[in-house]
Curated annotation (Swiss-Prot):
Mg(2+) 2 binds at E286, N288. It holds the Pfam family GARS_A. ATP binds at residues 135-194. Keywords: ATP-binding, Ligase, Magnesium, Manganese, Metal-binding, Nucleotide-binding, Purine biosynthesis. It catalyses: 5-phospho-beta-D-ribosylamine + glycine + ATP = N(1)-(5-phospho-beta-D-ribosyl)glycinamide + ADP + phosphate + H(+). Gene3D superfamilies: 3.40.50.20, ATP-grasp fold, A domain, ATP-grasp fold, B domain, Phosphoribosylglycinamide synthetase, C-terminal domain. The gene is purD. The keyword Protein transport does not apply. This is Phosphoribosylamine--glycine ligase. It is an enzyme of class 6 (ligase). Pathway: Purine metabolism; IMP biosynthesis via de novo pathway; N(1)-(5-phospho-D-ribosyl)glycinamide from 5-phospho-alpha-D-ribose 1-diphosphate: step 2/2. Signal peptide: none annotated.
């Protein structure tokens, strides 16, 4: 089967590997040639992923049978609508269904309309004075969000990126002046986790839970990034999540898919719920209309079933299930020094792939070109898969020793200490639970 993959980051390298394992003849379109994808694809087109017409031209030229969309920006640009008009079934939501991610105010209003469990108190403002008065009256810490896509970097939280509600009002005023509107939400305290599912518009197939490390530096400090790494456990749940929490989070995603169908926007593709586990249970922080990056790398590294068959099930409305190995995974991203604010670009990195393989680790390429030159975003990810989290983390660390160049990474991703910190956070918030082993 000829499959078009749109996107050239680490997430897409992981998707491409899984499609190739499933027997796909792979064709890729992305804005730069990912060296990992270049090796496994039959042909490679260079284009902005949001240039819908150009992507469609490549798809027609290659006569593809199926398309799989990696990143969010082309979804917002209507790439699924355009490919399906050409008769090419596509894994990914339409422009209208992708609003769950691309329009945060629409997503919150959708949750409210449909009584989706796990939702937060929110308000959308286009008037500066009204916004300030509401924040003053509310009185508790808030979260300030731009309405559109920000790559995870535009959200600011009081007590973290913002000192207090006064600073929140200043940032919200800036966003109203820039974008015309702003989303204000209650702050929810707890620990974040990622729950990804496959959906054909009706059926919802859960994947293992993953936890991401969004901050740039060790100890969860520094600017928010696209994600510096992530881990998953062999039991497919996380140490601080109870079976009841898992069921509640899954119900939120199932109710979301059901309500999307009811509203006339059947959701076909991957839905990613970014949850905050609060003392009362899981609360949805935001939806993403595609795989997470890095979280895709964790789950696809242990997918036992054929991704091509799952993709066919999604587009034909008959996805039945997905089996995953009972293994732990650790993904550590290496990023250019200075990332995310002022990254080094153009410098070369040296990667000893043979030595990495001997360590039992796996490499996933992202923002590097075919000459291993840094392009400015996260460069590559090192993946460890093992029976225990401790072993998986050691494998990823061992692989990193064979990469040279002006890059940095978070040594604490997937470590026992960092996970114990998250368990402590939940206990300090008053949540009663017995931690799962990982």
């Amino acid at each position: 089967m000829r499959v078009l993959l749109v996107g050239g980051g680490g997430r897409e390298h992981a998707i491409g590997e899984a499609l190739a394992r499933g027997g796909a003849e792979l064709y890729v379109v992305s804005k730069h040639k990912n060296p990992g994808l270049a090796r496994i694809s039959r042909d490679y087109g260079i284009s902005k992923e949001t240039d819908v017409e150009k992507v469609v031209r490549f798809a027609r030229m290659w006569n593809v049978d199926l398309a799989f969309i990696g990143p969010e920006a082309p979804l917002e640009a209507g790439i699924v609508n355009a490919l399906e008009r050409e008769g090419i079934p596509t894994v990914g939501p339409t422009k209208e269904a992708a609003r769950l991610e691309t329009n945060k105010a629409w997503a919150r209003e959708f949750m409210e309309r449909n009584d989706i469990p796990g939702r937060k108190l929110f308000k959308v403002f286009d008037d500066v004075e009204e916004m300030k008065a509401w924040i003053d009256e509310y009185g508790k810490p808030v979260v300030v969000k731009p309405l559109g896509l920000t790559g995870g970097k535009g959200v600011k939280v009081v007590g973290y990126q913002l000192k207090d509600n006064e600073e929140a009002k200043e940032y919200a005023e800036y966003l109203i002046k820039k974008d015309g509107k702003v989303l204000i939400e209650e702050r929810t305290d707890g620990v974040e986790f990622t729950f990804q599912v496959f959906s054909d518009g009706r059926n919802v197939i859960p994947m293992p839970l993953v936890q991401d490390y969004p901050h740039a530096y060790e100890g969860d400090v520094g600017p928010i990034t696209g994600g510096m790494g992530s881990y998953s456990c062999s039991n497919h749940i996380l140490p601080f999540i109870t079976k009841e929490d898992w069921k509640m989070a899954l119900r939120t995603l199932e109710e979301t898919i059901k309500a999307m169908r009811k509203e006339g926007y059947p959701y076909k593709g991957i839905l990613y719920g970014q949850f905050m586990l609060s003392r009362e249970g899981p609360v949805i922080i935001e939806y993403n209309a595609r795989f997470g990056d890095p979280e895709a790398i964790n789950v696809l590294s242990i997918l036992e079933d054929n991704l091509v068959e799952i993709a066919e099930g999604i587009v034909k409305g008959r996805v039945r299930g997905a089996k995953f190995q009972e293994k732990a995974t650790v993904v550590k991203y290496l990023a250019p020094k200075g990332y995310p604010e002022n990254p080094i670009r153009g410098a070369e990195i040296m990667v000893n792939e043979e030595a990495i393989k001997e360590e039992g680790a796996k490499i996933v390429y992202a923002s590097v070109d075919e000459n291993m030159k840094l392009l400015g975003s996260r460069a590559l990810a090192m993946v460890g898969v093992a029976d225990t989290l401790e072993e998986a983390e050691k494998i990823a660390e061992a692989g990193i020793r064979h990469v040279r160049g002006p890059v940095f990474y978070r040594k604490d991703v997937g470590t026992k200490e960092s996970i114990e910190k998250r368990i402590r956070t939940m206990k300090e918030l008053g949540k009663e639970f017995e931690p799962n082993s990982c």
